[in-house]
Each structure stands twice: as C-alpha cells, then as structure tokens.
C-alpha cells in the first residue's frame, strides 16, 4: 500500500525553474524471512528513490511520513472491513481489530527511546552500529541501517505494528544554480557565451537545462541545502557517523557553482552505449575551453 502511494506518484515530483524531476521509484521490497516458511512475515522493508530539485532532506522525510500514515490508515481500515465481512460470513461476532496507525521517523524513534532509557540506549545503539561495521565492513549500507533499526526496536515495549521512515542510502546533494550570487552569475554567463560561440558548429540547437537529472560527482562540490537540513538528514540516517560519513565542512570549504558540460548519447551503462561523436569530441571540449577562458578574464 505504501508503494502504491509513493511509486510513480507525480504529485511527489519536485518542480523548480520550469523543470520537473521524475517521480519516486521503488528500488526494492522484501520481508525479513531468510527462506520459505508457512509463517506470515512479521516485518518488511522497502526502498524508495527520491529525485529533488528544490526539496530538502527535511521535506523528503516529511513526505515519507505523511504517506506512511496514509498507507497505515488505509491498511487498518481495509483489514477491519475484510474482517467484518469474514465474521458475517462465518457467523462470528465482529470485534474491531486493535491495531492503530503508528508511524515514526528514525529521529522520533531514537528520541523516544532516549527519553525512556537515557544514555544506556544511546551508548548501546552506537556501540552496536560501530561493532556491526567492524565485523561486517562490506555489509550493504541499506541493510546496515535496517539492522540498526531492528536492534533499536528491541528496546520498544509496545510491539504493535509500526512503520519507521529513514534515510538508508548515500546522500547525493541537489545542485541548484539560481544566479543569485556573483559566482553563479559569472559561470552562467560564461556558459551562455560558450554556447553562442559553438552553436554555429552544431546541427541541432544546444539547450541549457538548469538541473542535471542523474547522479553526479558535482553533488560533492557544493551544497544548496542549509546546514539545518543536513542535520535532519543525519538524525534520520541510522548509519550516520558509524558507517556513512558526509563531511559538511569539507563540502562547504569547496562550495563552488557547478555545471555539467557533457556528452550526448544513448543507452548509458548498457552494452549498446554510444555517444554523438562530433558533439562529444569537438563541441564539448570547445565549450569547456571557452567557459573556462571566459571565467579567467
């Protein structure tokens, strides 16, 4: 139900400067059973990939929590309606099911357990995460986070069903060029100049897009989100500073405007991957050179 509400939901696309991200996509769904048994799975997990142009990590975790609440409400209502029908069919007295909607972010669960158990919990969960990484350094980052949450759940007294929303994978920061700073203005102006100079050598018009719609190393060259948003990211990432490290200060020490002047092609990362030779090996180097030269004036 949660996947139905999130996956390919265009209401969750992020629009900025006239460009729209693709909607969230489900990357994996699984229960915790190691093999086949006739027992109903007690727990499950799902990964969703969010693409952002202007949304912060705080915005994303808020969206996930709201969708989790909606999904939980729907499932509880559906279960009660189905159970009511079954009781009628079986001539059994219907009693409303005891389950209620219960959704946490990882930060909320962590705070609740800290308030109840104090330093005993925080020390235990930190040592657990640290030792888990030392014993299984190659463990997938997402599975690492799940194991940390499983361990924390042992400290929860109320074992009734719940959803925990968290950040499980690496953080590829959004890069938004607005032209609001002098450096951004200069870079955008230099790019425009290089395009005008090279355009007459191209068969097709060169179009500037304000966002690179894929994963790029440029995400580690600047930070468009504020520090508070990054703190929200860390507080909702079980692997933060035990297995996964994102040095905000290092990124901020660079913090330069970024553009991607790259090749044009098709079927990236496939056996049929290919590029437009003239554009890639002539136009792109020329635009890169002219952009740099213009910036150095």
Language-model regions, residue ranges each:
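An extended, acidic, His-containing surface patch that forms the Zn2+-binding/catalytic region
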Residues: 84-297
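Midchain, well-structured core segments that form catalytic/ion-binding scaffolds
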Residues: 1-148
């Amino acid at each position: 139900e949660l996947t139905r509400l999130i996956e390919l939901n265009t209401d969750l696309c992020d629009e900025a400067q006239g460009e729209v991200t693709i909607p969230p996509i489900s990357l994996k769904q699984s229960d915790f059973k190691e093999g086949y048994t006739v027992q109903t799975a007690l727990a499950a997990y799902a990964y969703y990939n969010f693409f952002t142009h202007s949304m912060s990590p705080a915005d994303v975790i808020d969206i996930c929590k709201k969708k989790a609440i909606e999904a939980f409400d729907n499932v509880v209502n559906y279960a009660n309606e189905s159970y009511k029908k079954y009781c009628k069919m079986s001539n059994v007295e219907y009693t409303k099911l005891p389950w209620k909607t219960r959704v946490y972010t990882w930060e909320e669960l962590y705070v609740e357990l800290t308030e109840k158990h104090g330093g005993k919990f925080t020390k235990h969960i930190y040592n657990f995460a640290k030792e888990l990484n030392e014993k299984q350094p190659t463990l997938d980052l997402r599975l690492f986070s799940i194991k940390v949450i499983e361990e924390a759940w042992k400290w929860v007294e109320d074992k009734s069903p719940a959803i925990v929303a968290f950040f499980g994978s690496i953080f590829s920061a959004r890069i938004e060029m607005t032209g609001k700073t002098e450096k951004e203005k200069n870079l955008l102006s230099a790019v425009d100049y290089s395009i005008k100079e090279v355009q007459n050598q191209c068969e097709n018009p060169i179009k500037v897009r304000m966002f690179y719609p894929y994963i790029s190393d440029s995400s580690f060259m600047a930070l468009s989100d504020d520090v508070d948003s990054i703190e929200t990211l860390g507080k909702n990432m079980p692997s933060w500073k035990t297995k996964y490290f994102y040095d905000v200060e290092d990124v901020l020490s660079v913090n330069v405007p970024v553009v991607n002047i790259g090749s044009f092609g098709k079927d990236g990362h496939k056996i049929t991957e290919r590029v437009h030779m003239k554009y890639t090996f002539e136009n792109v180097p020329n635009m890169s050179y002219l952009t740099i030269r213009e910036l150095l004036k």
